């Protein structure tokens, strides 16, 4: 994971997590709190910590999302909300499930092409009931999953422009190490940004088929 705060001297308003369960599931998650600074950081951190607790307790991802939404709603007087971007990967069969609440597109880098994963939903903490949109995909050997916050995609001009940049500029680099990949994308976003920067987070994870 690589991240940068939008405002100098203030905490990054994004939060992220990577968990691997004994049940053979890897969970990646990124949350973007409203605005920047300490308030945004508190919102995104709360969402991620709740997700981690529910995941460890064995709750379904759909129920966890509903409970996180309810928790943020209890603080609605303070106009708190946060995006939630979740990817769960079954490490036995490579099945990946993406769940998004207000989050920008995720990307799967596969060989020389980029697959975009979209969803149209509001962030957590706005409506009493959230519509959980799921996208299921079967991963292939060597796939790289990228979860980003809008500070990254906005720097490149949008989600489609980000996908194009990934294909043209990122894939030719041939990064095997996910951390190197995340660092490269973050640095490039900082160089491309033409307006006041937002908090920026890149979470990268690569999955290989286990050799028997």
Pin down the residues of each PLM region.
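N-terminal entry segment of metal-dependent catalytic domains or homologous docking segments
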Residues: 1-33, 39, 46-49, 132-135
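Active-site-proximal, acidic helix/loop segment immediately C-terminal to a metal-coordinating Asp/Glu
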Residues: 35-57, 139, 143-193, 211
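Short, well-ordered beta-strand elements
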Residues: 27-31, 145, 203-205
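DG-centered beta-turn motif at the end of beta-strands
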Residues: 32, 103, 148-151, 199
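PP2C/PPM-type serine/threonine phosphatase catalytic core
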Residues: 97-141, 147, 162-171, 175, ...
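Acidic loop->beta-strand submotif enriched in PP2C/PPM serine/threonine phosphatases
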Residues: 9-24, 81-84, 116-157, 193, ...
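Short beta-strand-to-coil "C-cap" segments at the C-terminal boundary of structured domains/repeats
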Residues: 205-211
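Catalytic core of PPM/PP2C metal-dependent serine/threonine phosphatase domains
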Residues: 41-111, 189-205
């Amino acid at each position: 994971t690589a991240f940068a705060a939008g405002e100098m001297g203030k905490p990054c308003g994004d939060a992220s997590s990577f968990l691997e369960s004994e049940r053979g599931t890897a969970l990646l998650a990124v949350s973007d709190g409203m605005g920047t600074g300490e308030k945004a950081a508190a919102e995104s951190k709360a969402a991620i910590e709740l997700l981690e607790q529910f995941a460890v307790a064995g709750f379904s991802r759909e129920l966890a999302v509903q409970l996180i939404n309810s928790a943020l709603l209890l603080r609605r007087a303070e106009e708190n909300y946060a995006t939630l971007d979740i990817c769960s990967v079954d490490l036995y069969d490579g099945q990946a499930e993406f769940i998004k609440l207000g989050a920008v597109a995720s990307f799967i880098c596969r060989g020389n092409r980029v697959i975009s994963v979209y969803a149209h939903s509001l962030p957590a903490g706005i409506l009493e009931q959230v519509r959980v949109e799921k996208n299921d995909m079967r991963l292939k050997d060597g796939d790289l999953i990228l979860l980003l916050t809008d500070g990254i995609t906005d720097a490149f001009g949008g989600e489609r422009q980000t996908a194009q940049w990934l294909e043209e500029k990122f894939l030719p680099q041939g990064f095997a190490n996910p951390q190197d990949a995340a660092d490269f994308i973050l640095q490039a976003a900082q160089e491309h940004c033409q307006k006041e920067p937002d908090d920026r987070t890149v979470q990268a994870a690569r999955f290989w088929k286990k050799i028997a």
